[in-house]
Amino acid sequence: MIIYPAIDIQGGQCVRLTQGKKEERKMYFDSPQAVAQRWQAEGAEFIHVVDLDGAFGKGEENMEAIEAIVKAVEIPIQVGGGIRSIEKIQQLLDLGVTRVILGTKALTDEAFLREAIEKYGDRIIVSIDAKEGYVATEGWVKTSSRRALDFAKSIEEIGVKRIVYTDIAKDGMLQGPNFDEIQRMKDSVGMEVIASGGISCETDLQGLKEMDVKGVIVGKALYEGKVQLGKLRGMDI
């Protein structure tokens, strides 16, 4: 199981939001690339980057920070947040990003998703952010009428191989993931599921590994010292 340390960027800084709420923001580090180097030094195999300004529709202001992260580490990077064009996908891949995560646009524009999959294959991930079972969009500000499980099945038919599944109610709460919903998603599709939201301790990670989850994104628990990457090396996680 791959542990993906999360680096959320807003205004060029490494921050965390609680349940995706802009007003519940905590800044941890000025330098996202220094954080990436720290996680790499502690044994991370892959880094998960979210452009929060992009997710909230603010454009290109964090591309410089993303490029700095790519240059600062040797491990692969996946990036999401406000990616709504083939040109933006190409721009990120040209910077050296390994995988690109699509969210809102994958839900609202099937033709775009098909084109992205046809062009880039498994370098495309779709993020399914669920709020009470329904897909949330626009940086989690809006909730669609599409059930998360139905959406997952539909994108699998298109050719998506990997999803990030987030339970928004759990995100940043340090109260444990929604094991039942993660299991339901795993049982419903054949895609690789990367779980996100709510990790609070090593026991949560062990539980997800026992469910055969292939990857877990860990954010606040790392920044608050609840989970230590170096310690995980000897824990068979």
Swiss-Prot record:
Reactions catalysed: 1-(5-phospho-beta-D-ribosyl)-5-[(5-phospho-beta-D-ribosylamino)methylideneamino]imidazole-4-carboxamide = 5-[(5-phospho-1-deoxy-D-ribulos-1-ylimino)methylamino]-1-(5-phospho-beta-D-ribosyl)imidazole-4-carboxamide
* Pfam families named among the record's database cross-references: His_biosynth
Name the Gene3D superfamilies on file: Aldolase class I
**Is Amino-acid biosynthesis one of the keywords UniProt gives this record?**
yes
Keywords in alphabetical order: Amino-acid biosynthesis, Cytoplasm, Histidine biosynthesis, Isomerase
Task: Give the principal location in a single coarse category.
Answer: cytoplasm
What are the BP-aspect GO terms? L-histidine biosynthetic process; L-tryptophan biosynthetic process
Q: Check the UniProt entry and state the signal peptide residues, or none.
A: none
Kindly identify the residues recorded as the active site: D8, D129
Query: What EC number(s) does its UniProt record assign?
Result: 5.3.1.16
- Gene Ontology cellular-component annotations: cytoplasm
| Pathway(s) where this gene product acts | Amino-acid biosynthesis; L-histidine biosynthesis; L-histidine from 5-phospho-alpha-D-ribose 1-diphosphate: step 4/9
Record GO terms (molecular function) = 1-(5-phosphoribosyl)-5-[(5-phosphoribosylamino)methylideneamino]imidazole-4-carboxamide isomerase activity
Would you say which domain of life the source belongs to? Bacteria
Q: What class of enzyme is it?
A: isomerase
Presence of the UniProt keyword Cell membrane in the record:
no
Give its localization.
Answer: Cytoplasm
**Record's family?**
Belongs to the HisA/HisF family.
Name of the protein described by the UniProt record = 1-(5-phosphoribosyl)-5-[(5-phosphoribosylamino)methylideneamino] imidazole-4-carboxamide isomerase
Gene label: hisA
